[in-house]
Amino acid sequence: MKPLYFLVFVVAIFLSSCEQKPQSPVDAVDPFIGTGGHGHTFPGATMPFGMVQLSPDTRKDSWDGCSGYHYSDSTIMGFSHTHLSGTGVGDYGDIRLMPSTGKLQLEPGTEENTQSGYRSHFSHSSESATPGYYKVLLEDYQIQAELTTSERVGFHKYHFPQTDSAHIIIDLFEGVTSDQVLDAFIQIENDSTISGYRRTKGWANDQHLYFYASFSSPFKHFGIQHNNQNQAMKTYAQGGKIVAWVDYKTAKNTPILVKVGISAVDVAGAKNNLKAEIPHWDFELQRGNAKNSWNKALNKIKIGKSHNKEDRSIFYTALYHTMIAPNLYNDAEGRYRGHDMEIHKTDSGRHYTVFSLWDTFRALHPLFTIIERNRTAEMVRSMLDMQSKGGLLPVWELAANETQCMIGYHAVPVIADAWINGIRDFDEEKALQAMIKSANQDLHGLKWQKSLGYIPADKESESVSKTLEYAYDDWCIAIMAENLGNQQLADSFYQRAQNYKNLYDTETKFFRGRQNGGFIAPFDPAQVNFMLTEANSWQYNFFVPQDIGGHIDLMGGDEAYAAMLDSLFTGKTAITGRKQADITGLIGQYAHGNEPSHHMAYLYNYVGEAYKTQALIHQIMNELYHAAPNGLSGNEDCGQMSAWYVFSALGFYPVTPASGQYIIGVPRFDNATIELENGNTFTVEATNFSPDNKYIQQLTLNGAPYPYSFIDHETIQHGGTLRFVMGPQPDKSWASEKKHRPQRKITGDQLVATPSIKADSKTFTDSIQIRLHHPKAGAQIFYSLDGSLPTAKSQVYSDAISLTASTQIRVLAKFENKQSSAITGNFYKIPAGRTIDLATNYSPQYPAGGDIALIDRQHGNTDFRTGSWQGYQGVDLEATVDLGKRQKIKSISIGFLQDQRSWIFMPERVHFSLSVDGRNFTEIGVIPNTIPATLDGSIIKHFELDIVAHKARYVKVIAVNRKVCPPNHLGEGEPAWIFADEISIQ
């Protein structure tokens, strides 16, 4: 018996050792994290930065389904080859394949009744995913579908039951959204090959995608539905709606495999991609190749133990999500579609698409400068190529199209950050000129930013956010110019980088919107409005990464700045104003679910209170990241949400990209090692590591004391060990001395901020008092009342100015031989006695200046977000104007704006009535609407009634709201808006 006992002992030891074998990074990844809630990720198969994202489609035209998939869904419509990861706008879902059995169905059908189409129920219990692989059972057909990929090829494996009626549907019409199919064609080349093309207009205005599909077994029958007409054995169709199918007689345990190569260039490119990357039919081999590729990519950072068993999965899933986009865009032989829509070939390296730069400049691209340096150079060259062929650096680039989504010119910090961090494999002078060109446009409020030093809220939407973000981008240009030896250029952009000061209100200590020379009142920092980008004033109040020291000075010093940060994180979470789905993950008014807040927890280091940063980072990682489908607090945004976690788990974060500096936080693991591309390793260790020990007691670098709460990029690249000694109580003295804190301050010539104008209104009937203010003690304010530019010989402001006639006042300030930009205020005298009574309430989000807005003789422009239109949601507008006395009336008109993409429509009709006593009204005319609700763009229409002269004192205007958005509109059935402006009475 002894040999038997020995054998059992050996087997037990072997099994124990197997159980203790370290889990590979791929095995730790959970692609379902972020597929629920508002994460907007997809679970399907892709390669690191691959062209193909082969994933199931479960819903369409849904904000929470921007990736095509949401974990709460229970049906699948098919598997398409392109998807976006974590975006807030949907697109893609190109070239859908769907296996089915039984009656041939060529429409997706409905979720409520899957029998109405080809979609199928599925269950998460029979669904699994890992990087590069996805599997699910289509319950309605009992088909198990498996997916894997190479970089440019999707590989399908369908396990059909035994049946004479197996189908594979190829749908070129359906996508993630109801994008417009501009053109399409399909060619059934033989009994095992299909090729085609899909050209669409969606978020990307003109997207081209070609495919070449090869089937492992010849299909016995096939056909094409062209514009809803089925034709069996048809081999070609072009234009309109195209859905094809192939039929099989299948045996159990004999799967059908399909390889689909894609290309933005042509069918030949798609075919070549397929042959170059998957020339075989071994699905498991390719699945293994994908796993190996992901393991190699994820092993760039090796982590140790954490005090939370979920943390390993959260970390490696986050790292996985950072490597999904940007996406490869050139074919295997180097050809790609440029921003001029022509076909080009890469000179070296690879060409990329999907640049979500408003999000990713903050942490994703800085992460790449550490772990993806060669790829970063390729991405920078891709951006410069886009500029050379499309005119400007990308803002939000998608499939060779500039979407103009979001704000700023944030390719600039990505390029500057790469260069500052030693990535120089691109034309630096060409890069600098491209940066300057973006900054010197007149687009998107830049005209005003350049002339005034800020963007007025009535001239451009998102004026506060744009002013602040342009200032940071301009600092990046200054840094680049200075390092390239162009100091004069650098100085001019350092001045522009201080434009944030023009929006700073010393009374409230917030950045505020301005119009007519003054700050807009009333002011509520918790209010979400169109002066800000997906945020309220709290969530933009600390976006001065280029001049944190200057911002601290404005607030009154370290203590005042720290107190304001305390208020941010400890205040009430209530949000006022318009609804904004992106504002999630709240800690006080800090919103981790959206990007503007991401750096804020690290700002305490700048005022010597690093222990507060440590506590907050610990809290955010504990509360706002989980190993669950709804484990992200907001949109993944092409890797930014996850890049925050990767950096923070390592113990540092890039508060100011392009500074070459990272701010120390608190690590999540007892050790983590970064494998650098130069052959060095940088290790972060944490001793006394436990859930309660969240505070730094000591920091050492390569064994020597390191008292600083920041670390340089160059130090990381040299390799070494950064060791944290942790404890349960804060060491408030650690890194509290100024010499140990990070310093980020513009030290050259200081900008003289613009003065501000204070007045109760911009209209008056008798007189109005105007006051001028400048935040700098000792600054002189000069003004003119005749519209001329003030000079040193102009009047010097000393006390309130009384106006009794319509006047344009121009104002500037001088301090220490420097002067500010000149600002302008226009004040209008309107006839006395005219008043307005509103029987219906306008939305508090869109007051346009209050009740008087409809008779203030000011007219709105084509952008409703500038605040000059009065908005009514789901209700009619009923207004009665009292002229003060009985007058002869010849015409009445009222202006309306339509922007159907924002659910704003023309009224169905406008009724006009007159009265002499304000009680008894006579309707004198009705003007019907003639603008179709489907007409796109921003449209202004004046509903005008010319009448035979009537005498009346009261004029009533009723604009009939359609109440709900029309059928087939994205907001169908939801409350509709009407936006009104000036009622003119002649």
Feature locations, PLM:
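Short, compositionally stereotyped local motifs that mark structural "simplifiers"
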Residues: Q743-L877
